[in-house]
């Protein structure tokens, strides 16, 4: 299957292998990104070590299901439960600054040109 693009190059065919690259290269806007959900696993483990936050594991792959929706059923309460652990990492000004900086850097790496980043410290 090919996808027809209605761009400057009239009816250009985009092959499936190139489609992912095409989407990645498109400039994007993100109007609703949560800082709590933008925490890198490696940063999470490092902040835990620095601030003595207990984690179920320090292995990034073992930690992933505790903070990301991986194989869980699509359930809103399961989704919200991930934030309980994530909120423990916003424990200092330096930690919040680092997490915010990395969230913006990650968005830029995804070719996001406009980002609305939100944070609810007490929810």
Q: Model-derived features: where do they sit?
A:
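Metal-cofactor-binding active-site regions of metalloenzymes
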Residues: 2-123
